[in-house]
């Protein structure tokens, strides 16, 4: 059994992340004119947007995807999760480093590398970034038909995106079964699991974010680090995106249990974990079912620390 925990020594994004520093609003507006009406000069004389305005946040996301990833068409239905692009990119880049461990230290690129995004959502952001940065192929799964419809529309209507397929999970109790085909192999899976245990808990969480945002309103607000501190980009979200019975812990334990059936079809299973105390519980479950190697990778964005746990059933993985 090999257990490794990474150490965060600096409060910054991954070195390959394109979103370090402040936003270049003139360049973003050039890529997406829809952003222009939302850009304003704050009290410090810096260009910014009102991060409490969901339409402004969506326009910023559209501009970031158009400018950095050559994805000119992107949209989400009203009420669906609008994720922070820089943080999503960090997960992808750290997975690339993880894949290098089992590829003689070299990050594998190209369409033969295949990832599964569990809970792709309507936004399709993880497949977009992974496809454009490393040319990986993706399957995105979701239990929500509208999410699959929109994510597929995004993937099929941007010429720069190649090899992204979205599949509907018809059984809410299954995570991998019904999605991974019998002869399919994935280099990795990834997931941003539902955080809350009920709709009421999710609503209360949204209200807390709004209060935090109001408290931070006097800050500059134009850099990614400041944006993360304000927790401004998780507006909206459908049931499947925000909560499930038992919350995050129940979901990731189910994922661990169900991963065993696909131990020969997936090289690395990974999942984000928001609640630090849930990491130890996941480790216990993985050790109980015979996982050979477990690794925790921490990521830092400003004052915010996030993490994902990766595991593989392969023996003799040299971490």
Curated annotation (Swiss-Prot):
GO MF, one annotated term: 23S rRNA (adenine(1618)-N(6))-methyltransferase activity
One BP term from GO: rRNA base methylation
Enzyme Commission code(s) on record: 2.1.1.181
Catalytic activity: adenosine(1618) in 23S rRNA + S-adenosyl-L-methionine = N(6)-methyladenosine(1618) in 23S rRNA + S-adenosyl-L-homocysteine + H(+)
Keywords, sorted A to Z: Cytoplasm, Methyltransferase, rRNA processing, S-adenosyl-L-methionine, Transferase
Protein localization: Cytoplasm
EC main group: transferase
Entry keyword annotation includes Cytoplasm: yes
InterPro entries listed in its UniProt record: METTL16/RlmF (IPR010286), rRNA_lsu_MeTfrase_F (IPR016909), SAM-dependent_MTases_sf (IPR029063)
One of the Pfam families matching this protein, by short name: Methyltransf_10
Superkingdom field: Bacteria
Gene Ontology cellular component list: cytoplasm
NCBIfam families, sorted: PRK11727.1 (NF008725)
Function statement: Specifically methylates the adenine in position 1618 of 23S rRNA.
Similarity field: Belongs to the methyltransferase superfamily. METTL16/RlmF family.
Record-linked HAMAP family: 23SrRNA_methyltr_F
Protein's UniProt name: Ribosomal RNA large subunit methyltransferase F
């Amino acid at each position: 059994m090999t257990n490794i925990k990474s150490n965060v020594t600096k409060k910054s994004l991954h070195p390959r992340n394109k979103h370090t520093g402040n936003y270049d609003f003139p360049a973003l507006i050039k890529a997406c004119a829809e952003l222009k009406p939302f850009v304003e000069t704050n009290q410090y004389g810096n260009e910014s947007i009102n991060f409490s305005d969901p339409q402004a946040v969506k326009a910023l996301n559209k501009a970031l995807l158009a400018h950095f990833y050559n994805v000119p068409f992107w949209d989400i239905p009203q009420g669906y999760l609008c994720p922070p692009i820089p943080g999503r990119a960090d997960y992808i880049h750290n997975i690339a480093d993880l894949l290098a461990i089992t590829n003689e230290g070299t990050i594998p690129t190209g369409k033969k590398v295949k990832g599964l995004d569990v809970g792709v959502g309507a936004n399709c952001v993880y497949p977009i970034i992974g496809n454009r940065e490393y040319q990986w192929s993706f399957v995105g799964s979701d239990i929500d038909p509208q999410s699959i419809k929109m994510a597929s529309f995004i993937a099929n209507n941007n010429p720069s995106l190649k090899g992204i397929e979205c599949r509907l999970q018809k059984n809410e109790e299954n995570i991998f079964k019904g999605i991974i085909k019998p002869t399919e192999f994935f280099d990795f899976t990834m997931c941003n699991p539902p955080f809350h245990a009920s709709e009421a808990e999710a609503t209360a969480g949204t209200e807390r974010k709004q209060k935090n945002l109001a408290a931070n309103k006097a800050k500059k607000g134009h850099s990614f680090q400041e944006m993360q501190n304000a927790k401004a980009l998780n507006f909206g979200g459908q049931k499947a995106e925000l909560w499930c019975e038992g919350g995050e812990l129940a979901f990731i334990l189910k994922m661990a249990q169900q991963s065993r059936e696909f131990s020969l079809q997936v090289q690395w299973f990974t999942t984000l974990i928001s609640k630090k105390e849930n990491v130890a519980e996941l480790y216990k479950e993985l050790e109980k079912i015979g996982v050979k190697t477990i690794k925790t990778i921490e990521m830092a964005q400003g004052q915010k620390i996030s993490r994902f746990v990766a595991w593989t059933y392969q023996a003799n993985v040299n971490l």
